[in-house]
Amino acid sequence: MIAGQKKRASDVVKELLEARGHDVTVWESTEERIMQLPESERAAAIANIYAQKQPISNLTDHYDLILNLVDVNSGGTVQRIVWPAAKGTPDQPFYVHEIPTIVVSVQHAFALADMPQVGTYINAYDGKDNTMKALVEKLAGESNFTGVSPVDA
């Protein structure tokens, strides 16, 4: 399958969670929204990027849990999470002490170094459909997480 046609891990997890009756919102980053604008409107949107900042109550009043899927290209020359320029938006995990937050790393086992403030970190090692299915089953308590990450132990 051509990589461009493959579903993102976040889309697969969203479908699996919704099939179990959960309400799921996938955050579209500020940068992604700006890139979808007509080119003539992008400069003004970039100049206004800090207006995207919002109070923590906008998150705590609407969400019970944040599941942050980190999909870093493990074959790239730089294997780090790249935080967008927008400050105070859900793009950056500033909310980890106000909302239960789980980080799941797919493709790359070393993302914890970029998010040490997160209390729950899971290495899924890949974003394949069957791995995401097993992840959701484990999050639902249908089977136990076992083992210790050889990377972050």
Regions found by a protein language model. Name each.
Residues 1-153:
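C-terminal non-catalytic regions of proteins with extracellular/luminal or membrane-system context
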